Amino acid sequence: MKFFIDTANLEQIREANALGVLDGVTTNPSLMAKEGIKGVENQHKHYIEICNIVDGDVSAEVIATDYEEMIREGEELAALNPHIVVKVPCIENGIKAIKYFSNKGIRTNCTLVFSAGQALLAAKAGATYVSPFVGRLDDICSDGVGLVAQIVDLYQTYDYTTQVLVASIRNTLHILQCAEVGADVVTCPLSAIKGLLTHPLTDIGLEKFLADYRKVNG
């Protein structure tokens, strides 16, 4: 399973990349706004900076919901760097745009997916990735991980090459559950990635090893 970091913060991306386990980055308009990145030109420069840090796919989202504008924005984003994957919302015009981009050889990430039906249409249109949002589904008492498992099964049944890129990861349990059901990728905050390293018995064991070493070696 691949690990992407879900942020537009360059320092967090560098820190995650330094661990040696980072495979890519996902961003969205909210994350860009959080970093104070304003204006299309500055956003494009920021995407290029991210691509220069990580040797992997970087999802950059279109803002438009109109088909023609989606195409224009997506082509501009794809031209920035070969690592760019155009992120498109799972709406009617988005599915049309994904089909267009697929025919042009432009890779896409179909985002804001909350049902197996949406995921099926995204794969049929040729999406490179599909992003089910597990945390947001859990928030409304739905089964986010169950949806991931359903999508994985559907794609295997019909031999779709679309990768399941799980988003809205809230904790380490989400990561492990998604791994167990066969997700291709999880994208999560740095805190969740680092959380996988944490276990109290590891800390206790390390403390004991060091204490025993100091007893013998001073």
Task: Label every model-predicted segment.
Residues 20-24, 80-84, 100-109, 124-131, ...:
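Glycine-enriched alpha-helix->loop->beta-strand junction motifs that scaffold or abut catalytic
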Residues 11-19, 69-73, 97, 115-125, ...:
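Catalytic cores of alpha/beta
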Residues 155-218:
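C-terminal alpha-helical cap/extension of soluble enzyme domains
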Residues 5, 60-63, 87-90, 111, ...:
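Glycine- and other small-residue-rich loops at beta-strand/loop junctions that grip anionic moieties
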Residues 29-33, 112, 128-140, 181-202:
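Glycine-rich phosphate-binding active-site loops on the catalytic face of alpha/beta enzymes
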Residues 28, 86, 122, 178, ...:
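Conserved, mostly hydrophobic/aromatic
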Residues 3-5, 9-13, 19-21, 27-100, ...:
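Active-site beta->alpha loop and helix N-cap motifs at the rims of alpha/beta catalytic domains
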Residues 44-58, 95-108, 144-164, 207-218:
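Alpha-helix-loop-beta-strand connector modules within alpha/beta enzyme cores
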